[in-house]
């Protein structure tokens, strides 16, 4: 039914996408040709395609147990990262993406991971600070579905195609870069060039499906925040959570919020299916 899918970024809110996709995909027999994801949405698009949603959620929720802080001061004093979420994310990616699973994904669809390239000759710490600051400010003031501040600053969009990943390490580097939000997540390096969170250019990179839409092929964009209005673009459908998801993007101590996001995705997926059935009956 949909030839292209977009998984927007959103950190832990992206577990909503897992619940929605797992509910809707079997009923609609979704077999998209191209799937694009940014930040944690890029991970969500891949583990849902592999049918590993339950495993990922349980592993993450288990890792949250017993944690009272987002920071690891003891590890930091010994030379580790202050925010352990980045190392935890990398460890999970290394466990998930074997050579066999990469081959499975490459044979299934044209998956693309969105990253942002900072302006050339900018020191990376400056680029990260300005890019993330501009993104957050625009989000708070304008609440756009598609951000524009990053492009105006000179950030460039880039896509890493899974078919060009020769080994799991290439995919893991792309996923880490797509979620790169210092100091929470480390800066990325892809193709010997610096890379930051794909959401700094556009958190919902539907631009990567524009050629399909222009050719008359329908696409579906999975957002991770409730929105009151979306752009009206031919052949594009947006879906979003029906309420605010009570979990912060990078938290590693809120398993209840992660489960809530997933369960809300299931409910919203069922509501979406009912709306499609109602439209079909009205025709």
Which stretches of residues belong to each language-model region?
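Patatin-like phospholipase
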Residues: 1-38, 46-283
């Amino acid at each position: 039914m949909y030839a292209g899918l977009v998984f927007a970024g959103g950190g832990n809110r992206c577990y909503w996408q897992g619940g929605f996709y797992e509910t809707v995909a079997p009923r609609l027999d979704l077999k998209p040709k191209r799937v694009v994801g940014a930040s944690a949405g890029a991970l969500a698009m891949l583990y849902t395609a592999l049918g590993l949603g339950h495993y990922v959620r349980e592993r993450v929720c288990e890792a949250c147990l017993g944690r009272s802080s987002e920071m690891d001061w003891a590890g930091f004093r010994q030379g580790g990262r202050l925010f352990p979420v980045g190392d935890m994310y990398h460890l999970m990616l290394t466990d998930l993406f074997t050579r066999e699973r990469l081959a499975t994904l490459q044979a299934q669809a044209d998956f693309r991971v969105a990253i942002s390239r900072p302006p050339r000759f900018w020191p990376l710490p400056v680029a990260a600070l300005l890019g993330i600051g501009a993104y957050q400010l625009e989000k708070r003031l304008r609440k756009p579905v598609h951000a524009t501040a990053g492009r105006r600053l000179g950030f460039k969009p880039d896509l890493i195609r899974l078919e060009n990943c020769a080994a799991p390490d290439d995919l893991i580097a792309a996923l880490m870069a797509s979620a790169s939000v210092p100091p929470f997540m480390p800066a990325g390096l892809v193709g010997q060039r610096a890379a930051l969170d794909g959401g700094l250019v556009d958190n919902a990179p539907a631009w990567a499906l524009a050629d399909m839409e222009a050719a008359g092929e329908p696409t579906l964009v999975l957002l991770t925040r409730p929105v009151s209005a979306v752009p009206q673009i031919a052949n594009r459908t947006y879906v979003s959570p029906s309420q605010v998801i009570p979990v912060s993007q990078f938290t590693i101590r809120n398993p209840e919020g992660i489960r809530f996001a997933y369960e809300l995705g299931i409910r919203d997926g069922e509501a979406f299916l009912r709306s499609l059935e109602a439209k079909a009956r009205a025709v």
